[in-house]
Amino acid sequence: MSQAPMVREHCERCLNSARWNGNPVLMIVDAAFDSIGLNYFQSVVPKVELFNQQFVATGQVRVLEDLVKADDTELRQIWKNSRSWKVAREIAAHLVWVKQQKKIGDRDALIYWAKNAPLNGWEKDPVGSIKGVGINTYQYLRMMGGVDTVMPDKIVKRVIYEILDTAGIKHPANDIEFVLAVEALAPGTGFRAIEICWMTWLIQSEAGLSRTEKYAALLPKI
């Protein structure tokens, strides 16, 4: 944690569903853009900020319903990948259904979904079953909805596998077992699973600097 001093603060925002100023529309767009595997800080974050400026700040997309109905041609002026927008709109559509069923707001709908979204059988969940939503996007959304968990992506796995190898512990057999293993190991490390997840990303180097150093001014905003 000493290598990533902003991790705990960032994870608190995540667990409080307060990333992107607590705006679920931006959190969903973030996850949808991130789902295609581009560099998060260099590609995804600037485009989410641009979407915020041109659609959210102008009042064009204020709530989840607006995102569901947003014009694809206009959206693709921000981000050209149509699949990302389809993923974003379908996630938003399910959360709109949650809103209506539970008579709650956008943020509470994300939180309610995340708290009730299963890890085992995630592919059968209404969000998990959306084409383009893999286990990493699913887990990322759960994290932004307040769940203390981890994404089984390649960077997190590489770091955790190095730790397991040093301890002589066998690698988990699949993504679900990996997530469960990290959740089980986390208390013994003094960190939460979500902190371990973000720490593995933020200690990575770009241009000779850790991401916490390189993006120090950006992290508090997201």
Please tell me what each predicted stretch does.
Residues 1-84:
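Structure-specific DNA junction-binding interface
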Residues 26-39, 89-94, 143, 194-207:
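Short, hydrophobic/amphipathic alpha-helical patches that form generic packing surfaces
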Residues 32-33, 115-167:
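Catalytic DNA-binding helix-loop module of base-excision-repair DNA glycosylases/AP lyases
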Residues 35-46, 96-104, 204-211:
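Short helix-capping/linker segments at secondary-structure and domain boundaries
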Residues 43-46, 151, 155, 173:
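Alpha-helix N-cap and coil->helix boundary residues
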Residues 54-130:
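Alpha-helical ds-nucleic-acid-binding substructure associated with the helix-hairpin-helix region
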